[in-house]
């Protein structure tokens, strides 16, 4: 017999009262029927769905040990922990520049997963190491998302990206914070143990800053309310998550995820934060005033490196939320040299990707130095950092990649500055040795 968590309705439509009857309690864990999804009743005992799942897992391991006595027991999931130096070296292969940010991330991630190892071996009387979530501050296209993605790949842990602008308070149109955890659960193929040691990157976190410091009669459902909702999962708590995502509803069974070991990396451009810092610094007697006043426009990483928690509070983040992000790192804007290196140097550089695609069609692809310089110049004009590089190249390469697979006589394709500017086509080298420039 199975008892649902809700008491049965009486014939008059009201709830049936237990009266003097004691509540149904699991004989193994002591949870009541109101605390679980379902309860199985025996002649003299009850067992809840959670204890059933735990029992199945225990029996599975025991049966496996009997059938395969020489096989070592299945180890608990452990991320591939590397030293900060090794972590940074791995990041260097994919992320150009941002030396200080990579060092900060390497140390923070190393300490985070070392903390998990310490917790696993803890006897209960050692110092408790708190979780160090990370805040990345930098303009769009500087590599915030790429840094987080590369870290997750390096450690071989589940990873998901959430857009803070899509989050709203529970009860309003939009995603609630549990949706983020549902995505992480999907990324781990519903392996709860892996999900609980994953990494979540929350992008555009600056967009959930309070719209105004003044109290308003209108609810800020995508600002301070979302910050409050994120607090519990940032610090660590057990959250019921709908396995299929979406909003929770009373009839839905939930998967409980403990977030205390999930690493959260939050990133945002924080436009205007440098002005808040500049005003604070200019009021001090440290001689910065004259230096700062001339830098009231544009992105100034040197000013942002002076950021404090008070500055973030003035920007619109609540103190409790700021306190959950103890590690802060400022990313540098990318100059022309860095953008050019991004095109050709990383393991998955855009130029290398296009060369590989052409190679699959039996064609060698080459970019002239002038062509790369034009790509960089156009990207700088657009002002979106490294993100503009792909859009510039894709706009140029789309017609070439459309036509080339049907050109069996071509063995080499050269992209020139004229190709990038669309004042001329690429130079094709045919298999007979002749060259042809497409107008």
UniProtKB/Swiss-Prot annotation:
The keyword Zinc applies. The keyword Transferase does not apply. Pfam families: AAA_2 (PF07724), ClpB_D2-small (PF10431), zf-C4_ClpX (PF06689). One of its GO terms (biological process) is proteolysis involved in protein catabolic process. Residues 1-20 are annotated as: Disordered. ATP binds at residues 139-146. It comes from the Bacteria. Residues 14-67 form the ClpX-type ZB domain. Component of the ClpX-ClpP complex. Forms a hexameric ring that, in the presence of ATP, binds to fourteen ClpP subunits assembled into a disk-like structure with a central cavity, resembling the structure of eukaryotic proteasomes. Belongs to the ClpX chaperone family. This is ATP-dependent Clp protease ATP-binding subunit ClpX.
